[in-house]
A protein has these predicted regions:
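Inter-motif core of Ras-like GTPase G domains
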Residues: 145-164
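G-domain G4 guanine-recognition motif of GTPases
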Residues: 161, 191-206, 226-236
Length: 281
């Protein structure tokens, strides 16, 4: 089955310096869900709840923290209150936040808390319900924290590099989460795979075709937009705040912002069960 990513031209259609993103959808709140306390997952709030995005992949080096920071930065840019819950013992999101503060680049509109285990995660989610958006950066291994993070999510975002090893790990993760969801008596959270560190040279190559065909065969939804391999993203995660605290005089920063905007719009649409109008050919 053909997939947009196979012929995607996101990089080639990046706007010029005058580009200004149309505001993200005005209401990111997910409709009320009433969930019973099952398997230690209390989720029975009435009223408005924050939208929860869980970034998960047990394989190290998949780019979870980059995706988490991009998500948080895009929502914060549109004036939503955001908190990143760093549930990874490596603390990469925490290091980014602390390094940014040390440089005087406090990530505007983004707070950060750490959650060392499943209990701390549960307490954090309940305590932070006044925020608009919660982004959970999960550990690089499959365990209780990742499971609980996924069961709570409006959307599970699974970063994946264009390689069959990475794709097979993503599929195993999804199947395990489906099993745990069934065991807990909870509906499976929506999820999307996003190709990370994507290179325009990957387009129309055999590895990309094989990975996309494999994920299609497994009925795994893949984002039409990918996060490109960019020095700008590496600079950002090294403690330079968000993309919107970097100089827009730099064309590479403008391109990264446009790329991030397109990705987050698609992920946001996925939480609502909709597909945005294609912007690439």
């Amino acid at each position: 089955m053909p997939h947009d990513i196979l012929t995607s031209g996101t990089e080639d259609r990046t706007p010029a310096a005058g580009y200004c993103a149309i505001p993200i959808l005005p209401d990111i709140y997910f409709s009320v869900r009433l969930r019973c306390t099952v398997a230690g997952v209390p989720h029975c709030h009435e009223g408005v709840m924050p939208s929860i995005f869980t970034v998960a992949n047990p394989k190290g080096g998949s780019g979870k923290t980059t995706v988490a920071i991009v998500l948080a930065g895009e929502f914060a840019k549109h004036a939503y209150s955001v908190v990143i819950i760093d549930a990874d013992p490596q603390g990469s999101s925490y290091q980014w936040h602390a390094s940014s503060l040390a440089r005087g680049l406090s990530p505007d509109g983004i707070d950060l808390v750490r959650a060392a285990d499943a209990g701390a995660l549960s307490q954090a989610v309940e305590r932070l319900d006044s925020y608009d958006v919660l982004v959970i950066d999960t550990p690089g291994y499959y365990g209780e924290v990742l499971i609980q993070s996924a069961l709570r999510a409006d959307l599970v975002v699974l970063p994946c590099k264009v390689h069959t090893f990475d794709a097979s790990q993503v599929v195993r993760t999804i199947r395990n989460l489906e099993r745990h969801s069934t065991d807990a008596g909870l509906p499976m959270s929506r999820y999307r795979v996003i190709f990370n560190e994507y290179d325009s040279l990957d387009r129309n190559t055999r590895p990309l075709r094989e990975v996309v065909a494999y994920l299609d065969a497994e009925h795994v939804p893949v984002c039409a937009h990918a996060l490109y391999r960019r020095v700008t993203y590496r600079t950002m995660t090294s403690g330079h705040g968000t993309l919107y605290q970097m100089s827009d005089k730099d064309e590479s920063v403008r391109k990264a912002r446009y790329n991030a905007d397109q990705v987050v719009r698609e992920l946001l649409a996925a939480t609502q069960g909709t597909t945005p109008t294609p912007t690439i050919a």
